[in-house]
A protein has these predicted regions:
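A glycine-rich, hydrophobic/aromatic-adjacent loop/helix-cap motif
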Residues: 2-259
Length: 259
């Protein structure tokens, strides 16, 4: 977990001073924190905006979580391995903000690489890093290529509470599909949950021209801060762990937020 919790006040809810039910991005410049997730403030921000119909309930989140864990049990059973009972540690593959703001307690961290998916600014952000009128872009895993990031181990003792909070964060509108991936590390491969872009989501941006990506990242801001800050933090987080991403580094330079 980060040494300094970025939580000082709840995400800003919409007020009468801005248009179309959108939160005023100028009122908040801080990252999401655990307290926001524990008290449901992120979902509340959606419910108080004109994006309310997109917010998932805890029941729907729990169903998605149960399905994801059930998929893991099924895979192990087919392989003749019945050791996954819900009491095993779980790995999460981090490729964006989970690298520099994981929020949940991390028992172990490894540099990891997955294949068949790549890091892409393919997810519109109309609340956290932008607005409906001026949407930001954040990262998703899209089809093809490979991606280096971090495998983060969550120990079994924390899973009952922390996995639901993780789902409240990543699956607040169902923009991702939680997917088990093979994360290859120097210490061996591990099965990890990755939040892969849901290409059927309202928020899927697809493959955009670089110029448009740069424009949106440079201009957009939302309740969790500027989109350019998200890019800068991700670029710095990767560099801290010795992970090279030439495409991300180029975007950071073009957006004026490179190291």
């Amino acid at each position: 977990m980060n040494a300094v919790d970025p939580c000082h006040s709840p995400p800003v809810a919409p007020t009468a001073s801005h248009s179309a039910g959108q939160p005023d991005a100028s009122l908040a410049r801080r990252e999401l924190c655990r307290e926001d997730l524990a008290r449901g403030s992120l979902r509340d921000a959606y419910l108080k905006s004109d994006l309310a119909d997109l917010a998932w309930s805890d029941a729907r989140l729990q169903h998605s979580l149960d399905h994801t864990l059930g998929t893991a049990r099924g895979r192990r059973k087919q392989a003749g391995n019945n050791t996954f009972t819900g009491s095993a540690d779980i790995w999460i593959f981090a490729y964006g903000s989970l690298i520099w703001n994981p929020i949940f307690p991390i028992a172990e961290k490894r540099v990891a690489r997955i294949y068949g998916l790549h890091r892409s600014f393919c997810l519109w952000s109309r609340l956290g890093r932008g607005t409906r009128e001026n949407p930001g872009l954040v990262l998703g895993l899209d089809d093809g290529g490979a991606c280096s990031g971090l495998a983060l181990r969550m120990d079994a003792a924390h899973q009952a509470e922390e996995l639901l909070l993780l789902w409240r964060r990543e699956m607040v509108t169902g923009a991702y599909t939680p997917t088990w991936v093979k994360a290859r590390t120097a210490q061996g491969a591990v099965d990890a949950i990755a939040f892969v872009m849901n290409q059927h989501s309202h928020a899927y941006a697809g493959r955009l021209p670089e110029a448009q990506i740069v424009e949106n990242i440079r201009q957009a801001a939302g309740i969790n801060g500027r989109c350019s800050e998200y890019l800068a933090q991700t670029s710095a987080g990767l560099a801290t762990h010795g992970i090279a991403d030439a495409g991300l580094k180029r975007l950071a330079a073009l957006c004026g937020c490179g190291a």
